[in-house]
């Protein structure tokens, strides 16, 4: 079983575009801009059409038209992220890492002010020059997958990762991630900061971790991208992606396929793209469908994150065991999508039975916190656990049955079909 909540993002529109660096011909170029934060109302709709077509009609050498492309990408970036410092100007950094004909691919980052609780925001973009202007899509959007499927710039395993259709937010009430903690399985690191915002505000999408061998690793397989120095994003399946910031010695990647546990860098205090950091750590954030989402309620490394009374508080739960801020989190590895963790709601053992209900004989027990594999589910007697009351029972891979009330599955429904 499981449960949680959500928060929308604000919209802003840029003005006063200033192109600082332009490289029109190579395969990778970077453009930095500065923008005020005046709200332009109706002008925003004119600049950023619902169709995603932005900017003047491109010339034949569309992908080399860096100023128009950069303006289009920047307009979309600043209208889709919440800029946290009122009245401030924000630098943006658009890097075109690949281009060919009418197509361009790269990263767009809104740099953060160098202050506490500030973090950069950004997206991976793909753009196509159409007669009406540049069509720009960001990772996690449905249009991104559509363009990635058509673009000659995206091939092989990367295309598979980028063309996965977005799922409903929080996977439609499904909080399974299939992720390990972002360090080696079997190590214990300290939770130095409980759930908090990527940029200091809601949603509380991120946690801070440090310790062990200080090597930061991919939480799940996917396609990896360098957003800026010290910041890596990995795009996974099921609409999820993960961000890793403040890294030292971070890898330089442009869509490389990485496996779960792949080296991304070391914990550090890097703030190349803004913000601040005290003491080496990794700022680990969870995204879905092009937006940061609350990390609370999701399982990472077989721990279920939970908010506290304020940002940076809270902790995580494995079975009935609780670990608050300052405690160690042991990386149990990824919980499979048809697996569950026993939560006896206070410790002790969970009785296994011969059928879906207490009317069936006991055939053994399971310790709190162990991982089980679910074969199928059926309705039986009703029970109340940590996450509520349910009549659902799960048949385990050994043929025995347990009440779903005492398992964390991430879903309030069968995770492997009905028996």
What positions do the PLM features span?
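Secretory targeting and sorting signals
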Residues: 1-3, 20, 27-63
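Short beta-strand edge/turn micro-motifs at domain boundaries
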Residues: 122-167
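Surface-exposed, glycine-biased beta-strand/turn segments
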Residues: 148-231, 315-348, 353-354
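Zn2+-dependent peptidoglycan hydrolase active-site motif and core
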Residues: 218-251, 272-281, 382-393
